[in-house]
Amino acid sequence: MAVFPKEFVWGAATAAYQIEGGAVEDGKGRSIWDVFSHTPGRTYRGETGDTACDSYHRWREDIELLKSMHLKAYRFSVAWTRIAPTGGTDWNEKGFAYYDGLVNTLLEAGIEPYITLYHWDLPQALEEKGGWQNEDTARAFAVYTAKMAEHFKGRVHQWFTFNEPACIVKMGYGTGEHAPGLKLPLEGQFTCWQNIIYAHCLAAQELRHTDAENRVGFVSTGRICYPASEAKADVDAARALTFACPDEDWAFTHTMSLDPLCLGRWPGPDLCGPQLSACIGAVPQYINDALSLGRPDMLGLNIYNAAPVQMGTNGPCYVERPAGYAHTAMNWPVEPESLNWGPRYIQERYGLPMFIAENGLSCTDKIYRDGKVHDVERIDFLARYQIGRAHV
């Protein structure tokens, strides 16, 4: 039986745009996702987050559900545009009031709030000035962070600055699948990336200056590989591909965030392709100097799956999965090994406390005649993955 240590923190995580709704209520400004989702052809069937899970009105019910599950932590993101509608210092008291209610009620329930300051929903007003291509956005983020830290001082001590820069940059500014829907070359994408790293460093300084008890975290996602066998050569091969940053697949790596923030240096040419290496070589010195301010106290890892790897005759190579392998409704492979090997490799390289900040699966959920969702697939998935997590 899988046994977890007493200090293991069981919790749940959400994102503002994905659950809150209340898109135009109580002074909230427009985010890039508000604009993107209302642009014809951008989302499936024109879906938007205008209502979403309606957590803006039903947050008390959400907390009751958390209590019923005996969870001790809740990671939620704050909608920047609910706090500052245009991303400046136009503070919205009704926005603060909403999060005050949420935080205070969580604390009363014995559930510790973990705040994510940015989960993809940039104020549209800042995007119109260049968004993450513009270094001023990093400074605006630091101002927003300072205000949040001061407002919640003494109540919130667990902070994550960013969630998944890989999705923010690659899917928002590279492929255009996510807001703001741009398709920039690698150089333009990397400019966004370095500005997000810079923003984290400035924000970390604000959080620590406001309250020495604050813990600063960063949530990363990226490629995880696991060895096709226990042979040392395969273990080394999987490690190598986990941290590699080739030009054609550089963003979805933990390396691109965690090397600069945890090690104080960008990944070198031994890991990076030539185009990426050239971008790294052009990072302004003041951003490199700021990296020492941004070392996290904790890491959030979003891990859903992994890829099997072995040492081939010409170096590390991917192994084809067997026919009929299990997958989710989104066609993501079900790979419990990801929660075993992923945290191992990350811990070896960075040596910081870790949270599995996201994990789960998509299902084709059905409500049966008894009014319930008999969640067999999800129960099976979580059982498999928790065993892998317990082994770590």
Residue ranges and their predicted role:
Residues D54-E61, M69, V78, K94-G101, ...:
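Generic alpha-helix structural propensity
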Residues M1-T43, T86-G88, F96-A357, L361-R389:
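Active-site region of glycoside hydrolase catalytic domains
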Residues E7-V9, Y56, A73:
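A common structural microfeature
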Residues R30-E64:
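Aromatic- and Gly/Pro-rich amphipathic surface segment
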